[in-house]
Amino acid sequence: MALWGGRFSKDPDQLVLEYDACIGMGERMAQQDILGSLAHARMLGEQGIIPKEDAEAIVRGLEGILSDVRAGKITWSVDAEDIHMNVETLLTERIGEAGKRLHTGRSRNDQVALDNHMIAMDQCKQTVSLLKGLISLLLETAREHLNTAMPGYTHLQHAQPVTLAHHLMAYVEMFLRDARRFNFTCEMADEMPLGSGALAATTYPLNRERVAELLGFSAITENSLDGVSSRDYFLDYIYAASCCMMHLSRFCEELVLWNSSEFRFVEMDDAFATGSSIMPQKKNPDIAELMRGKTGRVYGDLVALLTVMKGLPLAYNKDMQEDKERFWDAADTLNRSLEVFSAMFASMTFRTDVMRRSALDGFANATDCADYLVRRGVAFRDAHRIVGELVAYCLDAGKTLEELTPEEYRRFDPAFGEDVYGAISLETCVGARSIPGGPAPQAVAAAIASAEKKLAAL
Ligand code: ARG
């Protein structure tokens, strides 16, 4: 008979048991569930709500179950529906009557909320630690490439030259923000919901602050209805995960492009590429592509859980049991992606010579050429048109701006002097963009120093 079977004249249909059970997902919260019960039982004993000896027996029993769970010795059963009732049933089997007092002043509704809060906080910490590893790796690579010129793009067209360090630091900024989002999500989840009961708290004199303290929470939830029916902390996590996957997917897309024969900016390590079953020459950047694809799945988790929660009346509704699969799918996908991305990135080779050649190509210095004329007194709008005409001329003549003769320059505007070549060289173009946030080596070095401080503060 189910733990709640008293008012029923029949056992649940087998179809119901299987459809309703969530022990598959519940297994992953077994440790949090037992830790929560340990704190609850200790508090019940301290408050004299249950006899001290019973509380002690429960604590010993739960500690035994916890160590068996950690040792992988326990198989949970679908018949007991969820992790909460599985643990309680096992406890009573092991310690007898005292086990039946554990659930005093508690409901599975606040119990699952507690487990969820703990899991969300654990996963935030796990994700932040993976992000920190990736950020350190990117910083290390950026430090080596302060002077590695490459084209910067808009519309995927050569725009203005930047450096590889500057490009990588853009991702460092994104991942630093992601890590802060997860830390904020952890802060938001840091409220202890036990004591909310099924929905309307309880008449027992529970010491909620004590439970919070035993479990390391900094606060308790302030409203029992909200305590059992909020899933914001999971949604916050999945949103942060979606954002982080979006950043990874942009990086992956660039690596796919950079690895193509058209770009050849990077060479994927053989260990992180796969071949074709028919085309012997192929070496495909599958891992980067797959990660781009998995981003869609995490977005799906976010929309799915938002939709589960949409329009639900207060307080607990069984719909909410769908939360765990979406949460774990997002957390597992993201954490694994961060791990794989870091390994893939660490094994890649950058072809700095190709990047430099490409930066010299495609008129990435045309803006600097116009700025040169401006310094010579020409209005920017006129300078823009003159250099546009120069570019059209170069395209016809099959030349770059650096290859034009002084006479050719002067044909377009008498303000051009011999010093134009210095003004449009790659080093000048990059080096002159030295304001904070710019690609000049000293500006990027400053950005790296600032990112290191932010990383240390995470
Ligand atoms: N297994 C449920 C969940 O994961 C918690 C139990 C509450 N169920 C209930 N019928 N009151 O959300």
Q: Where are the regions that the model predicts?
A:
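Short alpha-helical "patches" and their helix-cap loops
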Residues: 53-58, 133-137, 182, 258-262, ...
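Conserved hydrophobic residue
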Residues: 49-50, 74, 263-264, 379, ...
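Short alpha-helical scaffolding segments that buttress acidic/His motifs in well-ordered protein cores
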Residues: 41, 62, 138, 241, ...
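A helix-coil-helix interface module used to build multimeric assemblies
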Residues: 1-201, 206-213, 274-275, 286, ...
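Hydrophobic residues in alpha-helical segments
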Residues: 45, 69, 142, 251, ...
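Short, well-ordered beta-strand elements within core beta-sheets of diverse protein domains
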Residues: 40-50, 163-166, 235-243, 368-377
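Glycine-rich cofactor/substrate-binding loops
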Residues: 1-36, 97-98, 279-458
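Charged, flexible cofactor/metal-binding loops and thiol motifs
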Residues: 117-128, 143, 151, 157-311, ...
